[in-house]
C-alpha cells in the first residue's frame, strides 16, 4: 500500500504507458472515492467533477471581486456552458486539474491583497500554486515564471512587502519541493 508497481512510496510522478510520467494529484484525489465506491468510471471521474465545480465557484468569486456582480454572473454562465469546461469536467485526465488549481491560486492571491487575513490567504494561494506543480508537467516552466512576474509586479506596486514575498516563496517551495526534486 502506498507504492507504485516499481516499489516507490507515494511517488510524485506516476509512470504511465510504460515509459512516460503522469501527474499524480488526480490519482491521489481518486483514492478515497475508489475506496468508498470501488473502481468504476464514477469514482474515477468524481474528483475532476468536484474540482471543476469548485473552479466555477472560484471563477465567479474572482470575477465578482474584479468586475462586479453582474459581470461575474455573465462570466459564470459562460464558464458553466463552455464546451471545454463541460468536457474537461467529465474526463479523468490529470492535466485538467491545472487550470482550476491555478484559478484557486489567483483567487486567493487576489483576496489576500484586499482582505484582513492577508498572510493566511497569501499562504493559501501559494499552496494552490504549489499543487499546480502536481497537476501538469509543463507547470515546471509556467509556475515559476508566473510567480516571479507576479512578485515583481506586486513589489513594484507596493501591494506586498518583501518579507511577505519571501514567506510566500517559502510556502510555495515547501509544497512544490518534492516535485522539483524529481524533475
Where are these regions (language model features)?
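Extracytosolic helix-loop segments that constitute the early lumenal/periplasmic catalytic or substrate-binding loops
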Residues: 1-18, 24-28, 32
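Short acidic/glycine- and proline-prone juxtamembrane loop motifs at membrane-interface regions
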Residues: 84-97, 137-138
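Membrane-interface transmembrane helices that cradle and orient dolichyl/undecaprenyl
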Residues: 67, 103-124, 129-132
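Hydrophobic core segments of transmembrane alpha-helices in multi-pass, intramembrane catalytic enzymes
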Residues: 52-55, 79, 94-106, 142-149
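Transmembrane-helix signature of polytopic, membrane-embedded enzymes
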Residues: 59-81
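Transmembrane-lumen/periplasm boundary regions of multi-pass, lipid-linked membrane glycan transferases
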Residues: 1, 36, 131-134, 140-183
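Transmembrane-helix motifs of polytopic, lipid-linked glycan transferases
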Residues: 46-67, 104, 108
Amino acid at each position: 500500500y502506498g507504492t507504485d508497481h516499481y516499489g516507490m512510496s507515494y511517488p510524485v510522478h506516476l509512470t504511465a504507458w510504460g515509459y512516460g510520467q503522469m501527474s499524480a494529484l488526480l490519482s491521489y484525489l481518486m483514492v478515497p472515492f475508489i475506496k468508498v465506491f470501488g473502481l468504476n468510471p464514477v469514482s474515477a471521474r468524481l474528483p475532476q467533477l468536484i474540482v471543476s465545480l469548485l473552479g466555477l465557484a472560484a471563477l465567479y468569486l474572482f470575477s465578482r471581486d474584479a468586475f462586479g456582480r453582474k459581470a461575474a454572473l455573465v462570466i459564470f454562465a459562460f464558464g458553466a456552458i463552455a464546451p471545454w469546461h463541460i468536457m474537461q469536467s467529465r474526463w479523468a485526465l490529470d492535466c485538467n486539474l491545472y487550470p482550476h488549481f491555478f484559478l484557486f491560486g489567483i483567487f486567493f492571491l487576489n483576496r489576500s491583497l484586499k482582505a484582513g487575513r492577508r498572510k493566511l490567504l497569501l499562504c493559501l494561494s501559494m499552496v494552490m500554486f504549489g499543487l499546480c506543480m502536481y497537476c501538469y508537467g509543463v507547470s515546471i516552466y509556467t509556475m515559476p515564471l508566473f510567480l516571479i512576474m507576479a512578485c515583481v509586479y506586486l513589489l513594484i506596486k507596493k501591494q506586498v512587502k518583501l518579507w511577505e514575498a519571501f514567506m510566500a516563496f517559502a510556502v510555495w517551495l515547501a509544497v512544490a519541493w518534492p516535485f522539483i526534486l524529481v524533475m
